[in-house]
């Protein structure tokens, strides 16, 4: 990962097992870690532009999708916020995380929360661009196959599908 000024604010978080393992989790057909680091960079720039607290914004950006599969599309912000609180994160970071899915979740109540909402949406567009660009040379499909093998969620889902298929078609 190249150095970016934003990473000075999150250095202590980058070695947490839950953050490290995002390199093996699929998110928008790319590694979740790519989405999170893209969100961090976007949050850094937006927080400077909108005069929000940089530290709060980039820390929330890195943690906003941690344990996202423990919730649903509308509740995973609350799940990630609770996890961040359990790690000792500032309440402002947790509040921003909880509302990052607006308008599907609660409305942001601070400038920092709005920064995360915008950064997450912008990062998601970057994720889609990364995936589509990779389709041209085959990198995206290769990466998606690798993630399906290393991501515990998709590995279990594939095993369930295979068992159902085998039960249906193999005597």
Report each predicted region and the residues it spans.
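Metal-dependent phosphohydrolase cores
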Residues: 1-171
